[in-house]
């Protein structure tokens, strides 16, 4: 590999007057190659343009140009091999150079600090995952408690409905009017519904009003029922005395 300026000038001499590399380095070698390729391309384009301008000498000039291109390409390949050798040597030298001791110690300290931080981050992530798992468990417990509360409320509402219905049965034994029975959800009947205090009140209800009452008490019925709906509603609110059961209900008004 050339080392002196004269050797470099001799090896990289060219007809394009491109300055040879000033030193045996990949930087200078690549600089020379780029300049050489650019100038060669310019000359090639100019030559081809001249060929096109002179059709009579086209074939001869084209042959000459092709030969020149072949020779120049071979020189480019030779230059490239030399630059590749320089690059490989530089890489080899850099791999053999050991950094100063203080630099190695700094890098080791940086690596230890980075490992410590990464370990801390991993611990933090595990803690977060544990907390998330605990929160999920708590959420599941709260959901279960909420479901239990809803079930308990439904049971209380059902007991309340049954309790009032039982009181109404006792009232009917003495021929008293009954009290309003809350729906199965714990709410009182809608205010726009006529109150029920006797079987006569049930008999005066429309089909829509009777359906709303039965749905509120959770009583199933068929849409085509008439008198059967009224009897079910009377039983649902505690109108179950003998004279209530024998009451002759009429159909729904049209």
Swiss-Prot record:
GO cellular component: cytoplasm
Keywords per UniProt: Coiled coil, Meiosis
Positions in coiled-coil regions: 41-86
Region (Disordered): 1-30
Keyword Coiled coil (UniProt): yes
Biological process terms in GO annotation: meiotic cell cycle
InterPro entries: Mug135-like_C
Family per similarity comment: Belongs to the UPF0612 family.
Protein name: Meiotic expression up-regulated protein 23
Gene: meu23
